[in-house]
């Protein structure tokens, strides 16, 4: 008579183990004082273009809204180009002249 109903077992959740360290501070930040910026990459570095693109993708202000994750797991930047009517004032004029 003290059996637990099967439906109670469906709502029980196992406690997930939480890591003791949530994130680690890189050594470059730990060595700098206060809010000083870490040393930037060298201009002759072949990965400087990659690093600058990565910084743009991981920008905290946009919260990843401009980044799409593909099926393979790679991050791709969304590029949305919109034509404004102010840039193309004659966009609808041609249509009216042809009688459509």
From Swiss-Prot:
<dbReference type="Pfam" id="PF15321">
    <property type="entry name" value="ATAD4"/>
</dbReference>
<dbReference type="InterPro" id="IPR028237">
    <property type="entry name" value="PRR15"/>
</dbReference>
<feature type="region of interest" description="Disordered">
    <location>
        <begin position="29"/>
        <end position="51"/>
    </location>
</feature>
<protein>
    <recommendedName>
        <fullName>Proline-rich protein 15-like protein</fullName>
    </recommendedName>
</protein>
<comment type="similarity">
    <text>Belongs to the PRR15 family.</text>
</comment>
């Amino acid at each position: 008579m003290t059996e637990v109903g099967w439906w109670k077992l469906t709502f029980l959740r196992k406690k997930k183990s939480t890591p003791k360290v949530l994130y680690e501070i890189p050594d470059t930040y730990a060595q700098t004082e206060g809010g000083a910026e870490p040393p930037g990459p060298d201009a002759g570095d072949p990965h400087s273009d990659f690093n600058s693109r990565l910084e743009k993708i991981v920008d905290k202000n946009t919260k990843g809204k401009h980044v799409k994750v593909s099926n393979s797991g790679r991050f791709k930047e969304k590029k949305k180009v919109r034509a404004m009517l102010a840039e193309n004032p004659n966009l609808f004029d041609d249509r009216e002249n042809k009688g459509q």
